[in-house]
Amino acid sequence: MGKREDICVVGDPAQTIYSFAGATPAFLLNFTKKYPDAEVIRLSAGYRSTPEIINLANTILRSGELGHDLDAVNSHGELPKSSAFTSESAELISIAEKVGETIKSGINPQAIAILARTNAQLEAIEDALNLVGIENQIRTAERFFERGAVREMVAAIRSGSVLSDPKGDWLSELRDLLKQFGENDKFARALIQLAYELSSDGIDSMRAFLRELEDRAEQNNPPALPGVTLATLHGAKGLEWDWVFIAGASASNLPWASAPIEEERRLFYVGITRAKRSLSISYAGEPSPFLREAGLVSA
């Protein structure tokens, strides 16, 4: 930077979870020491979650090094729930049952996420959901529009848009075009669902839809995939769902043994604040110390 002072920095020290990549809260917390004339604008209103969820998140942070509180502005909802199990298999069976009940009550599976500390946990959760026929998808680091299958679909749409009748039923044409990839292909279904949503917002041709896809690819703004989302706590950062289940919140997983405990606290905070309306946390065996600090289990 040299002597320049025209700089704007945006960040949340409570969500700094990548110290292994060199990111720590100190960069934000000590910014005014390096730039004493900087104006600090704190955004403390929590617009995503219910007050009950935000209160839990605040409690987690207050027990650590960061005294960072969010102010709830939404209407009240249900209290976050904590469930204990004697084994991981019993925990997974229960989660699958509860997710199934939530879907049967009329909740869109895309509004539900199950979060865990590691990818290995997600694979076990995936197996449990598959056993009872609950459609799901593991969120990976690979970007939607960079997937080989999606690239092929976009290429097919690009070719189809050349011959598409501008005054015809482009949605039917799109469905027929993507049938070659399989009627149950989750990526094709995501693109078709997006097309129907955009048609209500003024997208009226396959050419216009193609332009929208190209814009979204550039902005990394993918459509929602069908089914319940499974993601690691790291992978969930920046996302939100109405119903969130945090699985495997045991002492052996949270905090992770080789990770700094304060960063693990922030990681748990990130997971909690992904939930908009409902939050359920479960564990097998000894609970995470973070749950004890939050009063979700007896000391």
Model-predicted regions and their roles:
Residues 24-27, 49, 91, 121, ...:
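Short phosphate-engaging motifs
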Residues 26-34, 56:
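ASCE P-loop NTPase helicase motor core
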Residues 1-27, 45, 49:
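Conserved helicase NTPase motor core
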Residues 11, 116, 247:
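Active-site flanking residues adjacent to catalytic metal/cofactor-binding acidic residues
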